[in-house]
Amino acid sequence: MLQIKQICKQYKTGDLVQNALNNVSLNLRDNEFVAILGPSGSGKTTLLNIIGGLDRYDSGDLIINGISTKKYTDRDWDSYRNHTIGFVFQSYNLIPHQTVLANVELALTISGISGAERRRRATEALEEVGLGNQLHKHPSEMSGGQMQRVAIARALVNNPDILLADEPTGALDSETSIQVMELLKEVARDRLVVMVTHNPELAERYATRIVTLKDGVIRSDTMPYEPDTQTLAAPVHKNMGRSSMSVLTSLTLSFNNLRTKKARTLLTAFAGSIG
């Protein structure tokens, strides 16, 4: 269970202070599809970023399965993001010169998993999103909907407890948007999915719960959850696990990147010489 307790967040620019979130409290079930709905500037993306550990709250607490994050170090936050959270954004953030399989495998490189196991799990994740026959394609050879499916597979390959989606259909046509939403609905059967959207129709059609934000305050919640506080233990601090890739893995990735760029440069030079 994820608990958001009286979280406040401000952004300061010179003398200007913007209240992004104001005493936001929310309890989220382990498996539900929550849509965070609201206009631009309502605080919904800030809330999503705080849940994902991409941004820090000023006050309050974020409690994950009874673990308080108040005393989290940078390393704890890194490990939390890598082991607990899967991210899906409007932009797919795929590496263009890597194959689809390699893009998904990349999410596992910091976990110390063997190459064979990475390949097996990445293949499994791509099969789960309907791309089992596209493993060796590059992003440039795929449609927008297919690339978003790759991004979802990459988010799921670590088997995270929570999947966060920020406007996942924003760059897609209506037909492809429906396919992606159906996939997210399926994913939410056995984990928590939190999606930020401007689109009330998508939220009402696919989400099991809609939380509406405006001016940094929760205005409505279609299915609030109040756990039995008598059965909950007091939140504690706990150090997270490994959050960085090995030196060998870093060098391998760098070498592959340089090799690809070198090949491109040679091909360009050759084409220019005969052109």
List each language-model region with its residue ranges:
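ABC-family P-loop ATPase nucleotide-binding domain
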Residues: M1-Q10, R219-T249
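ABC family nucleotide-binding domain
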Residues: L2-T197
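A short, surface-exposed alpha-helical micro-motif characterized by mixed small hydrophobic
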Residues: A203-R205
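H-loop (His-switch) and adjacent beta-strand-loop-beta switch element
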Residues: I210-T222
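N-terminal Sec/SRP start-transfer signal
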Residues: K238-S273
